[in-house]
């Protein structure tokens, strides 16, 4: 590898397609009221791809080559296909990443090394942008095959859910990934709001084994924030569950904020370790993706 040179019923009640989420929720809250404000409410959207070079599991991950292109470029190219984003930037504290991104045409915002996670990096980048935005989409740079429809889905879910400050997406978890701590699991309530996220298996049954018949949910890295809340988030102190699980979204839940979750039909292909690169490349060859 080289771096860059240029089915329970309760579950079913909230499972909605990301693209149709807007219509379904709008009907629930009153289509007339929703349509009357849709052009103004959370309408300006920016996608931010936070990227850092240092990583305990995979140093230099954003720049790793995937079939001839750096991973950060592949994520950026997929993100540009989303119809809800008015602008896309890469936020990084590393000049190597910045130089690479500028080389393929991406806008770059330099951020400080003190950012503790991608969400804080997004907030710092947002403050440095000249234009004002209502929604910020945190697009994980290690999802080179992210579907643009998923980006659109989480944006629309946040736009039509006024009491939520955060939205994200989940997909079905493969039984063999049930005990993998790199595969974050999620449980939701009957209205589609997040209850909890964990690196462990949730829910966890008395047998201590993965139930192949239970619809476990896998969290996808894509996250959408109300821009005003993003500033609040950065000022909140780290919380016990967030620190124990090392999952930044838990700070949102621990402080009592609501998070909307949509379920999508998507096979997750994140890059967590060097071994994942070969898997991604094999899949892309199978799909004739260049």
From Swiss-Prot:
Transmembrane segments: none annotated. It is an enzyme of class 2 (transferase). It comes from the Eukaryota. It catalyses: 3-deoxy-alpha-D-manno-oct-2-ulosonate + CTP = CMP-3-deoxy-beta-D-manno-octulosonate + diphosphate. Keywords: Cell wall biogenesis/degradation, Magnesium, Membrane, Mitochondrion, Mitochondrion outer membrane, Nucleotidyltransferase, Transferase, Transit peptide. Its main location: mitochondrion. InterPro entries: Cytidylyl_trans (IPR003329), KdsB (IPR004528), Nucleotide-diphossugar_trans (IPR029044). GO terms for molecular function: 3-deoxy-manno-octulosonate cytidylyltransferase activity. One of its GO terms (cellular component) is mitochondrial outer membrane. Expressed in roots, leaves, stems and siliques. SUPFAM superfamilies: Nucleotide-diphospho-sugar transferases. Catalyzes the production of the sugar nucleotide CMP-3-deoxy-D-manno-octulosonate (CMP-KDO). CTP is the preferred nucleotide donor, but it can partially be replaced with UTP. Activates KDO during the biosynthesis of rhamnogalacturonan II (RG-II), a structurally complex pectic polysaccharide of the primary cell wall. RG-II is essential for the cell wall integrity of rapidly growing tissues and pollen tube growth and elongation. HAMAP family: KdsB (MF_00057). This is 3-deoxy-manno-octulosonate cytidylyltransferase, mitochondrial. It comes from Arabidopsis thaliana.
């Amino acid at each position: 590898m080289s771096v860059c040179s240029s089915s329970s019923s309760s579950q079913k009640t909230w499972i909605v397609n990301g693209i149709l989420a807007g219509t379904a929720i709008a009907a629930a809250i009153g289509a007339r009221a929703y349509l009357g404000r849709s052009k103004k409410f959370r309408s300006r959207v920016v996608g931010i791809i936070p990227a850092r070079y240092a990583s305990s599991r995979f140093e230099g991950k954003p720049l790793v080559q995937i079939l001839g292109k750096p991973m950060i470029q592949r994520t950026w190219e997929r993100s540009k296909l989303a119809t809800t984003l008015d602008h896309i930037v890469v936020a990084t504290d590393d000049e190597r990443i910045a130089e690479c991104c500028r080389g393929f045409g991406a806008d770059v915002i330099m951020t400080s090394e003190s950012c503790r996670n991608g969400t804080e990096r997004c907030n710092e980048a947002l403050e440095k942008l000249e234009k004002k935005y209502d929604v910020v989409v945190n697009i994980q740079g290690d999802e080179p095959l992210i579907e643009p429809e998923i980006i659109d889905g989480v944006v629309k879910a946040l736009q039509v859910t006024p009491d939520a400050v955060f939205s994200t997406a989940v997909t079905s978890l493969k039984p063999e990934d049930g005990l993998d701590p790199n595969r974050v699991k999620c449980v939701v309530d009957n209205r589609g709001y997040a209850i909890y996220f964990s690196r462990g298996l949730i829910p966890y049954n008395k047998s201590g084994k993965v139930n192949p018949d239970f619809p476990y949910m896998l969290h996808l890295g894509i996250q959408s924030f109300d821009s005003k809340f993003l500033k609040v988030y950065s000022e909140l102190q780290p919380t016990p569950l967030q620190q124990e699980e090392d999952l930044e979204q838990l700070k949102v839940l621990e402080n009592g904020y609501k998070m909307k979750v949509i379920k999508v039909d998507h096979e997750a292909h994140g890059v967590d370790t060097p071994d994942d690169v070969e898997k991604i490349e094999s899949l892309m060859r199978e799909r004739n993706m260049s």
